[in-house]
Amino acid sequence: MALLVSAYKSAKKDELYLFVPKEDGLEKLSDELLVMFGEPQHVIDFDLTEKRKLARVDAEEVKKALETKGYFMQMPPSEIEKMGDMPPPPEHLDNIF
């Protein structure tokens, strides 16, 4: 069964996202969480299903968090994760062939 979800991005930190059930909106979130997150900027509403592909997290993990906590916060990728998309340094290129 699909769950209609709203996604928000943080105005304070790049690549920090908050997912909440659309029917609840942001009203049920604590003031502390919203202060830490910063001004939420609405990105998209979508149906969350088990088969839904999300960028950096498993849909089932998001669904469980929404059911238990009422929200899911997707943290920015770590510096190591970001480096995974970078080409190897030039000194390592001689080993390619």
Swiss-Prot record:
It comes from the Bacteria. Residues 3-87 form the YcgL domain. InterPro entries: YcgL-like_sf (IPR038068), YcgL_dom (IPR027354). Residues 78-97 are annotated as: Disordered. PANTHER family: PROTEIN YCGL. This is YcgL domain-containing protein Tcr_0238. The lineage of its organism: Bacteria, Pseudomonadati, Pseudomonadota, Gammaproteobacteria, Thiotrichales.
